[in-house]
Swiss-Prot record:
Interacts with SOX2 and FGFR1. InterPro entries: HMG_box_dom, HMG_box_dom_sf, SOX_fam, SRY-related_HMG-box_TF-like. One of its GO terms (cellular component) is nucleus. Expressed in developing parathyroids of mouse embryos between 10.5 and 15.5 days post-coitum. Expressed in the developing central nervous system. Expressed in the developing urogenital ridge. A motif (9aaTAD) lies at residues 325-336. Its main location: nucleus. Residues 69-137 bind DNA. This is Transcription factor SOX-3. Residues 19-41 have a biased composition (Low complexity). Transcription factor required during the formation of the hypothalamo-pituitary axis. May function as a switch in neuronal development. Keeps neural cells undifferentiated by counteracting the activity of proneural proteins and suppresses neuronal differentiation. Required also within the pharyngeal epithelia for craniofacial morphogenesis. Controls a genetic switch in male development. Is necessary for initiating male sex determination by directing the development of supporting cell precursors (pre-Sertoli cells) as Sertoli rather than granulosa cells. Residues 1-69 are annotated as: Disordered.
Length: 375
């Protein structure tokens, strides 16, 4: 074993052979780097070979490749020189990189006793190298291939002419700086998220706006705050099937709302509404609620009445038509002969009479609002 190593290592700095390269044609002075990749992986778990390779360097003070000083071989390189030649002779078509992979795997399978002679030889070569080149320092070459790859896979802006990307960026910055409403335009593009087209939401807000009475001297509210509308409570009609207590409570609430100006009524109309509900047992409560609501003052202007109130003549005509439809709907569910039994039976006739009185009183008291009889 040692005789074979001595014959192979007589000229460790001699010209390299093509088999000692790492997959590419070896340049002069590149034999020191042969098999370096598997050697690094193999020496990572081997303390002796790592120590043997610790003082290596890759470049001397010379400027050309011929004057460059090679690094001393480590234990793996010493072992792989003979093995690489043997494997290349056995498999002439095998690529050099595949040979290096197999050599690295075989080196890891060796035991420490089998690696010991190669580790000792690597230490001896390192000591000789340090004596010959005491001022040697490893200076790695610049990797030009990686830089070329980075330039090759650059951003798509590299496809443009040299000054096109910078000119486009400058034009975009100038346009953004000269536009004072750039932020507003960007915000307008997000109005589609809520289902409104650009500017449609503001148009709806303008249509829903209302004019305050001229008696109001307070300044208008800020436009940023959303306008909250309240609707006329007296316009909501309730079923006559409700118990008397609930009807009196709702009638009192409607009278209080009307007296406070929520429906846009005058105080005299509010008094008339309170008088219209005088037959209910909650007259005192309604009067107290109306007196308390009158103290609200200008808060009534915040409330919006129904905008679709028809004139009184049309309201009375539609009211009669709705009452006729309601009579037909109720008669559908009465037993056969219900029309003849209306006069004899007090219950259905009284019920319809109560419906007539309820809707007539509510319609005359509340600003001509159409009752919601279709509900």
């Amino acid at each position: 074993m040692y005789s074979l190593l001595e014959t192979e290592l007589k000229n460790p700095v001699g010209p390299p052979t093509p088999a000692a390269g790492t997959g590419v044609p070896a340049a002069p002075g590149a034999a020191g780097k042969s098999g370096a990749n598997p050697a690094g992986g193999a020496n990572a778990g081997n303390g002796g070979s790592g120590g043997a390779n610790g003082g290596g360097g890759g470049g001397g003070g010379g400027g050309s490749d011929q004057d460059r000083v090679k690094r001393p071989m480590n234990a793996f390189m010493v072992w792989s020189r003979g093995q690489r030649r043997k494997m290349a002779l056995e498999n002439p078509k095998m690529h050099n990189s595949e040979i290096s992979k197999r050599l690295g795997a075989d080196w890891k399978l060796l035991t420490d006793a089998e690696k010991r002679p190669f580790i000792d030889e690597a230490k001896r070569l390192r000591a000789v190298h340090m004596k010959e080149y005491p001022d040697y320092k490893y200076r790695p070459r610049r990797k030009t291939k990686t830089l070329l790859k980075k330039d090759k896979y650059s951003l798509p802006g590299g496809l443009l002419p040299p000054g096109a990307a910078a000119a486009a960026a400058a034009a975009a910055a100038a346009a953004a700086a000269s536009s004072p409403v750039g932020v507003g335009q960007r915000l307008d593009t997000y109005t589609h998220v809520n289902g409104w087209a650009n500017g449609a939401y503001s148009l709806v807000q303008e249509q829903l706006g209302y004019a305050q009475p001229p008696s109001m001297s307070s300044p208008p509210p800020p436009p940023a705050l959303p306008q909250m509308h309240r609707y006329d409570m007296a316009g909501l009609q309730y079923s006559p099937m409700m118990p008397p207590g609930a009807q009196s409570y709702m009638n009192a609430a409607a009278a209080a709302a009307a007296a406070s100006g929520y429906g846009g009524m005058a105080p005299s109309a509010a008094a008339a509404a309170a008088a219209a509900y005088g037959q209910q047992p909650a007259t005192a409560a309604a009067a107290a609620a109306a007196a308390a609501a009158m103290s609200l003052g200008p808060m009534g202007s915040v409330v919006k009445s129904e905008p679709s109130s028809p004139p009184p003549a049309i309201a009375s005509h539609s009211q009669r038509a709705c009452l006729g439809d309601l009579r037909d709907m109720i008669s559908m569910y009465l037993p056969p002969g219900g029309d003849a039994a209306d006069a004899a039976s007090p219950l259905p006739g009284g019920r319809l009479h109560g419906v007539h009185q309820h809707y007539q009183g509510a319609g005359t008291a509340v600003n001509g609002t159409v009752p919601l009889t279709h509900i």
